Amino acid sequence: MQDIYRHQDIESHVQRHWEQTQTFTVKEDPKKEKYYCLAMWPYPSGRLHMGHVRNYTITDVIARYQRMLGKNVLQPMGWDAFGLPAEGAAIKNKTSPIDWTKANIQYMKKQLQSLGFAYDWSRELTSCKPEYYRWEQWFFTQLYEKGLVYKKTSDVNWCPQDFTVLANEQVIDGRCWRCDSKVERKSIPQWFIKITAYADQLLDDLDELEHWPEQVKTMQRHWIGRSEGVEIRFPLDHDEKTDLTVYSTRPDTLMGVAFIAIAPDHFFSAEIAKNVPALATFIEECRHIKMAEAETATIEKKGIDTGFFALHPLTGKKIPIWVANFVLMEYGTGAVMGVPGHDQRDWEFATQYHLPIKAVILLEDGTEPDVQKKPLIEKGRLCHSGEFNGLSYQESCDRIIDKLVDLGTGQRKVNYRLRDWGVSRQRYWGAPIPMITLEDGRIIGTPEDQLPVILPEKTLIKDMINPLKADQDWAKTSVAGQLGIRETDTFDTFIESSWYYARYACPKYDQGMIEKAAANYWLPVDQYVGGIEHAIMHLLYFRFFHKLMRDQGLVDSKEPAKRLLCQGMVLADAFYYNAQNGERVWVSPTEVTVERDNKGQFLNAFDAQGRDLIHAGMSKMSKSKNNGIDPQAIVEKYGADTVRLFMMFASAPEMTLEWQESGLEGAYRFLKRLWRFVFDHVIQGPTQPLKKENLNSTQKNLRRNLHKTIAKVTDDIGRRQTFNTAIAAIMELMNQLYRAPTNTEQDRALIQEACISVIKMLYPFTPHISFILWQHLHQSPDETHPLNIDDSLWPVVDQNALIEDETLVVIQINGKMRAKITVPMNSTQQEVYESALQEPTVIKHLKGITPCHVIYVPNKLLNLVVNNE
């Protein structure tokens, strides 16, 4: 054994061993408890970033720990390989997306292997391979036959830069999630999957996901947006045979309606606009602004009075109809009743356009609110509401709805914010949608014997226009002798990531989408790890697809994953200087020299050219701020184990992690000191068996702390998933071991036990150094201690070692603490009293007076009551 830790010498050696022995390749074993641990698969962008490293390290720690519990652990890896960036890169580099993607996968796979992740590479998946996407094409045709897929022309979110449709979830603050371009509205034919048919299941089953973060479940509940209300029909004044239907969750405010607002794309808006040029212009302006429901609360409220009126369903009063930019056709009916006295948005609109504002709800104290100053949002008893005056919120809702139903002008209604999933993308680099339009106009799914519909992989892309649209030879096909035209749109790439976890159970199965026996063995995923930014896109589609596969008879479980961990972002210092044109030029932290005071506080920074830099603080690692850190360079400098240890120690997994190279250096020092400690122990030769019954008090205390640490680390990793506190506990134990005596054979035997346990506990975090140190600690392996730590089991707590022989008792005189003494556990009052009287501080404060009363709390406290008179 060499005396100095050199990560370069050991990590590649250990990784070769894992590759050659296929250590982490698994198969179904009904005799063993399974554990499926999965990180969200990456897009092969070409380089790993530190966010990837953190995600995959967390997952690997969990997987290795569960393996040491004796479970059959599956931890696969693959590539979410379709996507728009490949097209942009292909244009820039004058290559095909497939060649660019393959090269990226090859490089990133080497990066992952260099970090020592325990993947079963025999199950590797790549979503752009026909053998993968053929099954989602097949599944899509099955859903079409079941009526869960349909095509319609609809207004969609259109990215003018990427020339493609965006799902609602992919529009953030009115801009494309990918390129930040301002999103427009456009009417084009689209394919949809009926996720709304599963809205109740998706909502209700969230309650069964006990081990998912509440934040994710709350976000999904809000996105699904189930609400109970009433649909109310307001007849048009000029044509009482025609109604405007409004959906409301606040029927108690019906008597306060001041206006009806309809969406710019409502059918009535379009009808009126034919004869009102100003309205037509307004509608056109609104068409180019995609807005999520959440944004309606913050935008400037704009509208146009149509000059038409609706009739109040209970009073017959005429109510003006407005077209407003804050009403969304996608939610409810595309028409809302404006109650400015009791809704903030309606109040802002009414105030701007000088519409009447009426209070119909009383304050809690029974007085009438001044709704001219601000709306009363809270619920309460009704006023100015005729026969409903004085009723409570629930009473008024029930009575008003009942009356509307009796009059035939309303009905109870459950509504959802969730909209069907538009899966068409006008891009080339995606899985072709397997639909065909025949000569007779019928649309059918591609027959199974013609699947997969293969993308022409070597296509060179000259611009962002989809080349499939122009490839007439590819689009032409025939079915049963009838000519047809293929669909030239491709799938939203969220399709591929919605079922990959199930395919990992049977990656080479060629008789169907899923081999049910294998899927039912491995599923559901026991631990899923990924960022919370996926809460309402991937994680919702992921759950939806699982239910679709269940109903297709492919899997038996209700949900895809039992437990979800959302790791925090990785932050790094960001520095910039202002260029002559006023633009900020961001400088990589690796090129910055920082000066700090003796307390470590930032003083100033400058780059290699001596320019003074402005410190923008810690921010998410990103290309835009040039503050990303290349994992490969860090691994080469410090080693994979150091990077892994730092990543897990620097922060709790769900919290943000602040990247500091000083933290890496600290982790590196710890591993070097650990190596040297084991070296010094090993070179002294083999140890004798530990005689637990003959340990002295010092040895007992050390062994007790060892097994307390095992108990804590076990709980921290397995239940609490606070990996940073687990590492802190191991480090604290090592500090005790560094100071421990090594004079006797029993001292060394105890050090041997401690080293073995520490190496086992560190193995999930730092597998390479643990692998080598384990071999040096076991010159003669046996069944209890196998040759390779990969085959060893997690250390078991010796409950007998935790038994305390001694305890610390507080000594008080007249309630004031005067001393602390160590006595044998369960000592009697007399024994503790006699020991206390020997303490110098007790003698000093008693001043020769004999206590008149003694109070004893066994193993904790002795209070001597003294009469000082």
Curated annotation (Swiss-Prot):
Keywords: Aminoacyl-tRNA synthetase, ATP-binding, Cytoplasm, Ligase, Nucleotide-binding, Protein biosynthesis. GO terms for molecular function: aminoacyl-tRNA deacylase activity; ATP binding; leucine-tRNA ligase activity. A motif ('HIGH' region) lies at residues 42-52. It catalyses: tRNA(Leu) + L-leucine + ATP = L-leucyl-tRNA(Leu) + AMP + diphosphate. Its main location: cytoplasm. It comes from the Bacteria. PROSITE patterns: AA_TRNA_LIGASE_I. Its EC number is 6.1.1.4. A motif ('KMSKS' region) lies at residues 620-624. GO terms for cellular component: cytosol. It is found in: Cytoplasm. ATP binds at K623. One of its GO terms (biological process) is leucyl-tRNA aminoacylation. Gene3D superfamilies: 2.20.28.290, 3.10.20.590, HUPs, Isoleucyl-tRNA Synthetase, Domain 1, Valyl/Leucyl/Isoleucyl-tRNA synthetase, editing domain. Belongs to the class-I aminoacyl-tRNA synthetase family. This is Leucine--tRNA ligase. It comes from Hamiltonella defensa subsp. Acyrthosiphon pisum (strain 5AT). The lineage of its organism: Bacteria, Pseudomonadati, Pseudomonadota, Gammaproteobacteria, Enterobacterales.
